[in-house]
Amino acid sequence: MIENQSDNIDNKEIDVSIQDNAPEDKSSMQNSTTENDELSSQKTEEINTEELKNTISNNDARLEQLEKEHETLKNQYVRISADFDNFRKRQSRDQDDLKIQLVSKTLTAILPIVDNFERARQQLKPESEEAQALHRSYQGLYKQLVEVLKQQGVSPMRVVGQQFDPNLHEAVLREPSEEFEEDFIIEELQRGYHLEGKVLRHALAKVSMGPGKQKSQQEVEKDTVEGDVDSDANTSEDV
């Protein structure tokens, strides 16, 4: 009986001891849990920060790549647009050139008729009333023909007094001139024409060689002596 009481007393002491230590153990566990939570939260934040940095870095790289692709596409567009514009202009020029070639071929065949009218106007001097009436009729046709050429973009060249240009003129004759300097056109032998600013037919012209060379006194005396020698030689042969 006494032993049982003693055991009960011991058990109570143990319970009291356990109860006394329980708050300390509980507090220690709470502190440990808090520390673990803080470490876990810190690690999570570090992981999230690293992931965010990686995401930003990847986005920056992707943005840089897209900017390069955009610049490449932009340059391609500019080149294609320029090529198309050049192609369109070239096509327009080719069509204009073809049109001018076709028109010029036809007009070139008409120009000799115009030349004949102009020569007739310069050479013919009708005297009778009937001849004058016929002449006026021909000149009326000539004016109509010139007007048609004008409507097609044909314009005559005015070359007399102009400096010779092989791109516009063809020199048929060259002769000295006191009036015109060297390489200036003295006379128009056949009229030249433009078509839309381009040469339809070159003008045939007589070109100045400049003032004729005047002999010096020595050259005149030399020619006189040579003439006398030739005369003496001829006289000797006759004898």
UniProtKB/Swiss-Prot annotation:
Keywords, ordered alphabetically: Chaperone, Cytoplasm, Stress response
Compositionally skewed regions (Basic and acidic residues) per UniProt: 43-53, 216-225
Protein name: Protein GrpE
GO BP annotations, alphabetical order: protein folding
Originating species: Prochlorococcus marinus (strain MIT 9301)
Matches recorded under CDD domains: GrpE (cd00446)
GO cellular component: cytoplasm
Xref: HAMAP family: GrpE
Stretches the record annotates as Disordered: 1-60, 208-239
InterPro entries hit by this protein: GrpE, GrpE_coiled_coil, GrpE_head
Record has Cell membrane as a keyword: no
Protein's cellular compartments: Cytoplasm
Name of encoding gene: grpE
Subunit note: Homodimer.
GO molecular function, one term: protein homodimerization activity
